Structure formats: C-alpha cells, structure tokens
C-alpha cells in the first residue's frame, strides 16, 4: 500500500475528482478526511469507503470562509490525530462571461474557494508538517491555468494563482521535509461542473451540448476527456514516496494540450 498509515485531508471530495482521490487513497491505506459544502454527498462517499474496509471521516465546510477552513483542519486532527497529506481540490467555476461583465463579488468568491482556501489550509497544516519533517500538499489546479479560454477569468486567475502558491510553498518547505506539487487536469466531463459549464458554453456558441463537447475534445491530442480516476492516479503518485524527488511541479493530465 502506497499510503499506509497516512492521514489525508481532501477538500471538495463529495463527488468528482475529490471523490475519486478519496476512494483511491483509502484503498492504498490512508485514512481520509473529506470536506464539501453538502452533507449528503460526503456521507455517501465516507459510507462507501467504510464498507470497503477503509477509514474515513468528514465535515461540511464552505472553504471560502476562513473559519470553515480552520474548523475542517481541526476536525480532521480530532478524528485522526494529525494530517500527513493535504489535497486542495475544492472547486467553483463562477460566471461564464467576459471580463468586462464579470461581477467583482463573483470574482472574489472564485478566488476565495480556490486560491485563498488553498493558502489558508496550507498555512494551517504546515507547522505540523515542519515539526515532523514530513508532509505533502497537492493543489488541484487546471488546464485553465495554462491555456487560454474565453469567459472564465475568475477560474483561470484562481487556478494560475494556485501554481504560484505551489512553487513558493515548495521552495519554503523543501528543506523541512515537505513536498508541494500541483496537477492541471484537462476536461473531466463526468463531473457536474464540467457538465454545467458545457451546457452554458453550448448555448453561447449556438450549438448543442454534444457538438460543443466534440469540438473541444477535437483540440486535444488524444481526442478524449480525462476521467476522475486518471486524475486520482496522478494524485496518488504525487502524494506517495514514488514521487519523493518531485516538488514545486505542475503536472498536466490533460490529454495533450499544455506542454509546460
């Protein structure tokens, strides 16, 4: 087992990529503590993990709030005693509009859920990790941080900011036993966020949803979407000792779009 006896705090883990990461980490021996905004999905996911013989716990949290970030970390420590791995995965796309029409309140919300929450949660776990000279932080960024797509300025800015945070935190933690990396997923069309976004984009483009998706996927070298399980496998690699020489990296899992 690649994560035996490790404790992982995984945000945005009631469904989609976070849920897939939680299941795989539990299968590989980690105790997983999950957060999301809704109780029902968390209860379902932790129940599945427990029935499979894994260890899990959860707390609902709105990670745009500093108080909820602190409460999530405290709840994970209360449940399992420590945090060895932090996966910042919570996500919110925001309005699909051009920059000139993007409401500031929505921009601030997207930045808060992605970048600000990743900063706050990292800040809350780093002292513990430094004291042990051991720990891993993984930030789930996006292809949008590297490729240019219209109508998503808040999301792109937040995800690009996460890459900067990744590099700085990696530089600070490298001699203290802490590794920090990021994943930039491409389109994971099975997630609700991707489905909702596709519907909005199709309407703006004057095509149906299947046509919009086919056109987008045609721009990928592999010509297909990624799966949540593929992102989870990359997350497992980056959070295990198999990637012990890697820190400060942003790993593209995008089917062949970004090459840096």
Q: Can you describe what each PLM-predicted range is?
A:
Residues 127, 171-172, 244:
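Alpha-helical segment proximal to the catalytic Tyr-Lys
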Residues 122, 158, 166:
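Active-site helix of classical SDR
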Residues 174, 179, 246-248:
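Short, small/polar-rich loop/turn modules that mediate ligand/substrate recognition or access, typified
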Residues 97-99, 103-111, 198, 216:
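Substrate-binding pocket helix/loop in short-chain dehydrogenase/reductase
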Residues 7, 12-16:
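Conserved glycine-rich cofactor-binding loop
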Residues 93-96, 235-236, 247-260:
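Short C-terminal tail/terminal secondary-structure segment
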Residues 142:
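Residue(s) in the substrate-gating loop at a strand-loop-helix junction
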């Amino acid at each position: 087992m690649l994560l035996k006896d490790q404790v992982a705090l995984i945000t945005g883990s009631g469904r989609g990529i976070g849920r897939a990461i939680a299941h795989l980490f539990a299968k590989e021996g980690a105790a997983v503590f999950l957060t999301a905004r809704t109780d029902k999905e968390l209860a379902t996911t932790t129940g599945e993990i427990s029935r499979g013989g894994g260890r899990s716990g959860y707390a609902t949290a709105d990670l745009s709030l500093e108080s909820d970030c602190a409460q999530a970390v405290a709840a994970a420590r209360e449940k399992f005693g420590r945090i060895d791995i932090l996966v910042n995965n919570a996500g919110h796309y925001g309005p699909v509009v051009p920059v000139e029409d993007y409401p500031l309140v929505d921009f601030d919300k997207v930045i808060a859920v992605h970048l600000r929450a990743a900063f706050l949660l990292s800040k809350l776990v780093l002292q513990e990790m430094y004291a042990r000279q051991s720990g891993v932080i993984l930030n789930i960024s996006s292809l949008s941080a590297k490729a240019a797509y219209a109508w998503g300025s808040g999301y792109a800015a937040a995800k690009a900011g996460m890459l900067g945070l990744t590099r700085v935190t990696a530089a600070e933690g490298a001699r203290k036993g802490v590794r920090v990396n990021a994943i930039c997923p491409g389109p994971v069309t099975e997630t609700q966020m991707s489905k909702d976004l596709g519907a909005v984009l199709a309407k703006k483009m004057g095509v149906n949803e299947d046509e919009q998706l086919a056109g987008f996927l045609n721009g990928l070298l592999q010509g297909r979407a990624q799966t949540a399980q593929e992102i989870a496998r990359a997350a497992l690699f980056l959070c295990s000792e198999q990637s012990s020489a890697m820190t400060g990296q942003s790993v593209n899992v995008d089917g062949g779009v970004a090459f840096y």
